Amino acid sequence: MDRAQKEKLVDELGQIFESSGVVVVAHYAGLTVAEMQDFRARMREAGGSVRVAKNRLAKIALQGKPNEKIGELLTGMTVLAYSEDPVAAAKVADAYAKDNSKYQILGGAMGEDYLDQAGVKAVASMPSREELIAQIASCIGAPASNIAGAIGAPASNIASILSTIEEKAEAA
């Protein structure tokens, strides 16, 4: 890799560190190619990406960035998992770490905040953006359905009273 390619890679990594909602750093030593492809596929499904880069170049890309502290995690065979959604990459990485003992989460960053292993697990346990939107929508919709039920209730009560009166009149 010549100098121009390295500079381009540093710029790309810098963009990743700046624009991602979450970045997870993990060791992947011992993973087979098939296992790594499976991890990449899972990450793509969730809207995230996976990048293996030279640690030295990643550390250069982190210089001056708010999440520069994750450079301390970049030792050995590391992989970067990232996504714009602040939860997606952490969820996939945590689930994959549970399925495969060779994949070990070291930590990461969420925006400007440094995350240790426990922090990544905590982020992974949070609901995703879509789940939060669904929860908010159901909370907003519940009062409206209650009001509609309350408005419709007197009409159904009147109808049942009228049918009862009609039945009594027919019986008499």
Curated annotation (Swiss-Prot):
GO terms for cellular component: large ribosomal subunit. Keywords: Ribonucleoprotein, Ribosomal protein, RNA-binding, rRNA-binding. Gene3D superfamilies: 3.30.70.1730, 6.10.250.290. CDD domains: Ribosomal_L10 (cd05797). GO terms for molecular function: large ribosomal subunit rRNA binding; structural constituent of ribosome. One of its GO terms (biological process) is translation. InterPro entries: Ribosomal_uL10, Ribosomal_uL10-like_sf, Ribosomal_uL10_bac, Ribosomal_uL10_bac_type, Ribosomal_uL10_CS_bac. Part of the ribosomal stalk of the 50S ribosomal subunit. The N-terminus interacts with L11 and the large rRNA to form the base of the stalk. The C-terminus forms an elongated spine to which L12 dimers bind in a sequential fashion forming a multimeric L10(L12)X complex. Forms part of the ribosomal stalk, playing a central role in the interaction of the ribosome with GTP-bound translation factors. Belongs to the universal ribosomal protein uL10 family. This is Large ribosomal subunit protein uL10. It comes from Dinoroseobacter shibae (strain DSM 16493 / NCIMB 14021 / DFL 12).
